[in-house]
């Protein structure tokens, strides 16, 4: 939430809205929490026993499940876009590759079958939450958190989303994206910077 708010403020968007949208964007994961990596405390991963297409359906359903929960618990409608749009129409790449590897070259395995239903982000704030969500997960997986490596990874991820058309429906400029990337890098580097080691 801090990441999205800081980036939104930096480009003159609504930082508070981006922060609150960040709090609610993944509420759909509450329906099937153990199918999501961040909730798997042990080695057992239920996706190991499932067909990749079924896994994709379960993962992508957290968007529609989120909207159902939001309506049930009277979440303000202004937050619905964050729930619906935080993955846009991006593919669930892990399960796409798993299906390709299991297919023996079957041409029936199509990338578009592994995409979220969308829609793509329609505001600067929902696009920022999309980028913050992607960035945070990817940077956590890195071993080298030096400022240059972090910013390089962030810019690569943003370029991939841009090339995939995810920002076609919102009014982000290239200048905005540069400011967002720099802000993300600064905030994340601050989180991962080496702590001072005190003598015992």
Task: Kindly label every feature range from the protein language model.
Residues 162-200:
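Long, hydrophobic alpha-helical segments that serve as membrane-spanning/inserting helices
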């Amino acid at each position: 939430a801090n990441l999205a708010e800081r980036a939104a403020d930096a480009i003159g968007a609504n930082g508070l809205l981006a922060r609150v949208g960040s709090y609610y964007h993944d509420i759909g994961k509450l329906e099937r929490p153990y199918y999501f990596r961040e909730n798997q405390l042990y080695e057992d991963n239920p996706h190991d026993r499932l067909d990749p297409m079924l896994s994709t359906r379960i993962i992508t359903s957290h968007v529609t499940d989120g909207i159902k929960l939001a309506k049930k618990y009277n979440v303000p409608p202004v937050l619905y876009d964050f729930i619906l749009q935080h993955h846009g129409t991006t593919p669930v790449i892990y399960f796409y590759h798993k299906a390709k590897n299991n297919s023996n070259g079957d041409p029936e395995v199509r990338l578009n079958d592994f995409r979220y239903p969308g829609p793509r982000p329609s505001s600067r704030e929902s696009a920022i939450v999309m980028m913050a969500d992607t960035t945070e997960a990817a940077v956590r997986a890195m071993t080298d958190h030096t400022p240059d490596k972090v910013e390089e990874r962030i810019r690569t991820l943003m370029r991939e989303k841009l090339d995939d058309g995810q920002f076609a429906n919102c009014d982000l400029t290239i200048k905005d994206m540069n400011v967002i990337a720099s802000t993300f890098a600064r905030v994340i580097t601050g989180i991962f910077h080496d702590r001072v080691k005190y003598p015992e």
